[in-house]
Amino acid sequence: MNYQPTSEDRFTFGLWTVGWQGLDPFGDATREALDPAESVRRLSQLGAYGVTFHDDELIPFGSSDNERGVAHGAGVAHQAVPAGAGRDRHEGADGDDEPVHAPGCSRDGAFTANDRDVRGTRCARAIRNIDLAVEHVARASTCAWGGREGAESGAAKDVRDALDRMKEAFDLLGEYVTEQGYDLKFAIEPKPNEPRGDILLPTVGHALAFIERLERPELYGVNPEVGHEQMAGLNFPHGIAQALWAGKLFHIDLNGQSGIKYDQDLRFGAGDLRAAFWLVDLLERAGYAGPRHFDFKPPRTENFDAVWPSAAGCMRNYLILKDRAAAFRADPQVQEALAAARLDELARPTAEDGLAALLADRSAYDTFDVDAAAARGMAFEHLDQLAMDHLLGAR
């Protein structure tokens, strides 16, 4: 099989992924800084469709209006990758990455900071960056990750008030986008913890519930990340299925994670391989049309010689899993096993003829054979082993 990616695969990378220098709380950088234009060029050569970037990654925090207007970095990124691939991640709008985005003042977050003046300046800054995204990036969307929106102490934050302020901030952004006539939507990225002890909107479910309380919920969706949901011990494909069901999967971050621990950002497929298989199967069967975006970090043990193969491995692993999932679905024995597991019945409404018909149907309760139903096996194990055979290349 040919697992060479093309632009039709819509694979994208954050500039901060291949550009990560290996700096962590316990050690200095192990790689030199990369020029963003070089990152874009190399990713394009590998077959990537586009790039994403943090709001201050190409135009530094504190730049003058004139400097922002030039937007040199955004122009380079847009020109060097196939057209229409850009996406501006306004993670700094939430004050997520303090050393890069806002020294000191966002130590308690941005939209939910206890300091009212900090909230005001961060909202204003987010609006300025929206203007930049719309002006310089084709088909822009903005991701909001509230990495510092949270607390370590129960007394430090009234979460109800904090959610009010979070709602207020997103409503202001939605109002501005609507007034300006911008074709732009917001994708909220959940994460349970790190860098804060506990972060607000920690999971896909929390974010989906929050969105329904906003004044313009149609402008907002989610940007789930594999590792973030798995840090909370959750089933990532299930979360994605619910986001798709709600029509709110605006973007997705693919990487690898091995269990409940710190955010590992492994290359895609290098963590929970079974979850990765079911995720690819779901995205492809659902016809998800958005980019397959990789938010990973080449390990700090590696030099630059391994950075680009690591990025290529993300795409290759996705394509291998896509091939394996397609073979699984096309297998006649799998079709038989799916029927034996009665997946077709799950797709049918329980009360197909409505409430009155259900209540009038004696077989639904009065004459229902409990013993016969209890004796039925579900045949899930055979179906799952067939999936394992395909995943492991044994079929």
UniProtKB/Swiss-Prot annotation:
BP-aspect Gene Ontology terms: D-xylose metabolic process
Keyword Metal-binding: yes
Superkingdom of origin organism: Bacteria
Record-level GO cellular component terms: cytoplasm
Catalysed transformations (reactions): alpha-D-xylose = alpha-D-xylulofuranose
Enzyme class, spelled out: isomerase
Enzyme Commission number(s) of this protein: 5.3.1.5
Cofactor: Mg(2+)
Keywords of the record: Carbohydrate metabolism, Cytoplasm, Isomerase, Magnesium, Metal-binding, Xylose metabolism
InterPro entries for this protein: Xyl_isomerase-like_sf, XylA_actinobac, Xylose_isomerase
Annotated binding of Mg(2+) 1, by residue: E189, E225, D253, D295
Catalytic residues in the record: H54, E57
GO molecular function: magnesium ion binding; xylose isomerase activity
Cofactor comment: Binds 2 magnesium ions per subunit.
Localization annotation: Cytoplasm
Entry binding sites for Mg(2+) 2: E225, H228, D263, D265
UniProt-annotated stretches for the region Disordered: 80-108
Assembly and oligomerization: Homotetramer.
Family, as annotated: Belongs to the xylose isomerase family.
Protein name: Xylose isomerase
Gene source species: Streptomyces lividans
